[in-house]
Amino acid sequence: MIFDKDDFKAYDADLWNAIAKEEERQQNNIELIASENVVSKAVMAAQGSILTNKYAEGYPGRRYYGGTDVVDVVETLAIERAKEIFGAKFANVQPHSGSQANCAAYISLIEPGDTVMGMDLASGGHLTHGAPVSFSGQTYNFVSYSVDPETELLDFDAILKQAQEVKPKLIVAGASAYSQIIDFSKFREIADAVGAKLMVDMAHIAGLVAAGLHPSPVPYAHITTTTTHKTLRGPRGGLILTNDEELAKKINSAIFPGIQGGPLEHVVAAKAVSFKEVLDPAFKEYAANVIKNSKAMADVFLQDPDFRIISGGTENHLFLVDVTKVVENGKVAQNLLDEVNITLNKNSIPYETLSPFKTSGIRIGAAAITARGFGEEESRKVAELIIKTLKNSENEAVLEEVRSAVKELTDAFPLYEE
């Protein structure tokens, strides 16, 4: 049974209507979740292509099934483009997600039970950097490092001292909620000083790295992992990079047959076309605008004494705001903003005192609104609308004003041009 879009609507109206409602939600909402973005129609077309039919266990030129000549071309395009973007000698484009990429990196670098240092979740790390609820924290002996309690910045002297004490086999750098530049060369110096390997998870900043607007970890890390969405503006998926041939072999084996079976070649195709977009000079302009818009929003909060920006500002696509002077917690803030069609997420802040289901902060990202065409003026307006909402949470007239302002912005910058 092969049918076109109109047949799909008639065949499964329930699913069609759900997708249509999500399209409407995305069009009419201001999206500030830092891990989300808006992909191109080319990315969606590739991901929805006939390649979804093809099973292709293995790697280009070394498949377990026949009929893979074409998908070999597709995957090779993705690999070569990824290598060109990040200046890496080897790339694996098959990971289904960033977590899968991290899992494969760990398998390639260490053994179960080995000691690993990773960034504390409340300081900005990720679940896969050693959280007890994650496979990482359950498989390896993770010891967390934190940001400085005063500056809320990475303290490399403290990290070195901690590394000398715990003697890790691996140090993991990278974050999901850290708004400042990360000096990967210092992390490599620390790793070398204690005889550890360095792995960098650059999932959040990969697009900025690709555009040359954040220092690249690739020359310093033994293995670099990333997602292909977020600031890279591709499909949801993972990517692993290295300059070490022996590690590249281990990575390939860790992905297949280690933790995955057949790759999702339709997603690999979507990665390939998104990588071509990243190689276009227009992407560097986009990435620069992401940072400008992030700073523009942060500046509005910095001028209001009722809010506190973690670490005092931002140098990338996101920042955290302590909202506890204005509302009870981050969850309350998230829910209030949902009501006015502004979407973001509650987020723990360094040395958090509330549960991760409530949190003291919210995380604000600029990647998706920038993809829609928002500039600094619109970004400042968005920050003002957030503040207006949180300070007038029980004033329905004010909240309706915010909804109208949100609608004006989303109408002015459609998700996709017809």
UniProtKB/Swiss-Prot annotation:
Chief site of localization: cytoplasm
Pathway where this protein functions: One-carbon metabolism; tetrahydrofolate interconversion; Amino-acid biosynthesis; glycine biosynthesis; glycine from L-serine: step 1/1
SUPFAM superfamilies: PLP-dependent transferases
Alphabetical UniProt keywords: Amino-acid biosynthesis, Cytoplasm, One-carbon metabolism, Pyridoxal phosphate, Transferase
InterPro entries: PyrdxlP-dep_Trfase, PyrdxlP-dep_Trfase_major, PyrdxlP-dep_Trfase_small, Ser_HO-MeTrfase, Ser_HO-MeTrfase-like, Ser_HO-MeTrfase_PLP_BS, SHMT-like_dom
Site (Plays an important role in substrate specificity) residue list: 229
Any one GO molecular-function label of the UniProt entry: glycine hydroxymethyltransferase activity
Assigned GO CC terms: cytosol
EC number: 2.1.2.1
Cofactor(s) this protein requires: pyridoxal 5'-phosphate
Keyword Amino-acid biosynthesis: yes
Listed GO biological process terms: glycine biosynthetic process from serine; tetrahydrofolate interconversion
Annotated (6S)-5,6,7,8-tetrahydrofolate binding sites: 121, 125-127, 246, 355-357
Pfam family, one: SHMT
Intracellular or extracellular location(s): Cytoplasm
Positions carrying N6-(pyridoxal phosphate)lysine: 230
Catalytic activity: (6R)-5,10-methylene-5,6,7,8-tetrahydrofolate + glycine + H2O = (6S)-5,6,7,8-tetrahydrofolate + L-serine
Subunit structure as annotated in this protein's UniProt entry: Homodimer.
Family designation: Belongs to the SHMT family.
Role of this protein: Catalyzes the reversible interconversion of serine and glycine with tetrahydrofolate (THF) serving as the one-carbon carrier. This reaction serves as the major source of one-carbon groups required for the biosynthesis of purines, thymidylate, methionine, and other important biomolecules. Also exhibits THF-independent aldolase activity toward beta-hydroxyamino acids, producing glycine and aldehydes, via a retro-aldol mechanism.
Protein name: Serine hydroxymethyltransferase
GN (gene name): glyA
